[in-house]
């Protein structure tokens, strides 16, 4: 979370004073203001300390850095969520793409979610939201019904159109982990169909090169990648291009990117435009 103001360098969320907080994952980001992961963990520790004893912390049980945050001091009841049956809240995927999963609470199945969202990250998001609502007394059956009606938000694998058998998605890709899990969910849904990615490193952290080494692996499931490497990038985009498994090409501007996509795309393809610009 970004800092509050030029005179208050604490992350904005320390002012929220939540009764229930979801800690979904913790990775290095916002390289323009944080020097390292430890600095981000300190801010999360401050957030944890603001949640009262009568509140609840819902924590991704798979995340080692969040476990380290809790070890810094936590006096609020904690419930873990994830894919592990030992967690208080567990998701058991019924479809590989994440569009259907069973919800298990303390070893007992409480319902099934079927929705249009894809990817493990969305399964965890939905599970955490359900756990948070249950923590404040919302009926689980009502939560399940609400999740089934949820149609996601803008720019999160949003289908913007289909033309000549080509489906185009808009995705707010801000971090390699999010890119990887988003594409993995799409791959599970479309099977062997071609996935073509138009990638722009647009966030401050991306442009500074903080995630450069992780970018190529995050694109592993793509069959083709068109990488928008603007001349002002301060890091070597060619090194990333060379490490991408699929057919990859760098272009210098948006017009060249569109021209390359037109040449690449064919009926049956899934074209994902990934940029947070």
Predicted regions and their residues:
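Extended acidic/charged loop-beta regions that coordinate divalent cations
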Residues: 1-28, 67-112, 149, 153-156, ...
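Active-site donor-binding loop signature of nucleotide-sugar glycosyltransferases
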Residues: 83, 115, 253
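Flexible active-site lid/hinge loop adjacent to a nucleotide/diphosphate
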Residues: 1-73, 116, 176-180
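N-terminal leader/targeting and accessory segments in enzymes
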Residues: 56, 64, 90-92, 118, ...
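Short glycine-/acidic-enriched loop or helix-start segments at secondary-structure transitions
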Residues: 6-8, 32-33, 67-70, 90, ...
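ATP-dependent carboxylate-amine ligase
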Residues: 19-20, 45, 74-77, 108, ...
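Short, hydrophobic beta-strand segments that form beta-sheet elements in well-ordered domains
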Residues: 56-61, 77-82, 225-227
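Short, polar loop motifs at secondary-structure junctions
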Residues: 61-65, 83-84, 232-233
